[in-house]
Amino acid sequence: FNIPYLDTGKMYRAFSYLCLMKNININEEREVEKVLPEYNEIFPCISLDILNSEEIGRSASIISQYKKVRDKMVSLQRDFGIRNGGVVEGRDTTTFVFPETPFKFYLYAKKEVRVWRRYNQIKGNWGKIAIDIEERDKRDRERKFAPLRFSGEAIPIDSSNLNEKE
């Protein structure tokens, strides 16, 4: 199939990378907001190795809490959906970005499987990866703007026993 696909998490990671390259303190919301006008593409040319790094993941989780950052990303995501249709993957895609979409799926996996997958992806410290995943989930559930939640309309799919291709 040749279906357009957008990984919204990579957008936050790419913006996080941009902030870090400009030596922006990601814990300072106003400083992060100043960089937003420079982020005009959904995916700048950044290697996946960099985007998938622990540092970028941690900082992306922090900046994704900021309302103006989310507003900008959601606007780009909705534009993508309107222009291209297709599959959009992300933590608040079915509850906030495209709540009216008729096809909603909620993929999840057991914690140890998520840690194992992440470990295989970045070859980092197992314990640190587990803590990072827990902290990110907590931040995403507790953020004020578009918190992570399960849409009762989505079809839940446990991906614990599935491989990446499946």
What are these regions (language model features)?
Residues 11-86, 97, 112, 116, ...:
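ATP-dependent small-molecule kinase phosphotransfer cores
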Residues 121, 125-129:
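Metal-dependent nucleotidyltransferase catalytic core
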Residues 91, 118-119:
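Short, flexible helix/strand-to-coil boundary loops that buttress conserved ligand/catalytic motifs
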Residues 66, 104-107, 111-115, 121-122, ...:
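Glycine-rich phosphate-binding loops of nucleotide-dependent enzymes
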Residues 88-96, 146-154:
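Glycine/charge-rich, flexible interdomain linkers and switch-proximal surface loops
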